[in-house]
């Protein structure tokens, strides 16, 4: 068999658009025959799938699963190209499968997840006909007493995963605590909290905010020493905007979320702590390609 060189792999990738490892395998399977390797990739649907990977996948859905008595949960974002596909049964089933693989395999990274999934996503690309990407995921598992809760809003547009720790397993199982989890998830989804408490905000983020607030005060005509004093008050307002426990509760603006947690803890007779949360919004940060109308018409007519 001919030696498979890096140059051969690179040339096959350039011609087919397939992944590096797929190209290497194709060459190995065909004894280094370039044309046969191209055919092998096409037969496996890998060349077509790889070409689709060049298209922007900014639609999709955020999906969640919580199991094991609310002790183990997953939040995952899977992207595709169109809303039509995102609402289809095949894509929803794929999202659910990906989430269950995360629960079972406990991958530490996207690379590890892709390995655990095998050819599942590539097969879905070939079947559905769109670029599909598993973009990100988070997995929470309760170590002691506590519970995990997930909330999905608007057909998978926004998703939240939150973990609470509690004084005892009995407190975690209390209906009031389950209801609290849901209220907190709704709060995070709607008010876009970024951190649990002020202590969780990185020092560089606080310093950056201080610099901005000080510059704002000076631009308002305040002297530097006065501006410094103003920053102290304004940074507290910043915490109230980005920290979950400092936010006003959306259902009662006279009460902070932190006060709500303490109130429920008093009712159930045990300490409750918000350990962590994550909020995903479908497609956030993905730059969508802007097509003009003429290009769209040509594409739909099969001319482009």
UniProtKB/Swiss-Prot annotation:
SUPFAM superfamilies membership: Elongation factor Ts (EF-Ts), dimerisation domain, UBA-like
Keyword field: Cytoplasm, Elongation factor, Protein biosynthesis
InterPro entries for this protein: EF-Ts_dimer_sf, Transl_elong_EFTs/EF1B, Transl_elong_EFTs/EF1B_dimer, Transl_elong_Ts_CS, UBA-like_sf
Predominant location: cytoplasm
Record GO cellular component, one term: cytoplasm
Pfam families membership: EF_TS (PF00889)
Localization of this protein: Cytoplasm
Gene3D superfamilies found in the cross-reference section: 1.10.286.20, DNA helicase RuvA subunit, C-terminal domain (1.10.8.10), Elongation factor Ts, dimerisation domain (3.30.479.20)
Location of the region described as Involved in Mg(2+) ion dislocation from EF-Tu in the Swiss-Prot/TrEMBL record: 82-85
Coiled coil spans: none
UniProt GO molecular function: translation elongation factor activity
NCBIfam families: tsf
Summary of the function given for this chain in its UniProt record: Associates with the EF-Tu.GDP complex and induces the exchange of GDP to GTP. It remains bound to the aminoacyl-tRNA.EF-Tu.GTP complex up to the GTP hydrolysis stage on the ribosome.
Family recorded in the similarity comment: Belongs to the EF-Ts family.
The protein, known as: Elongation factor Ts
Lineage: Bacteria, Bacillati, Bacillota, Clostridia, Eubacteriales
Gene that this sequence comes from: tsf
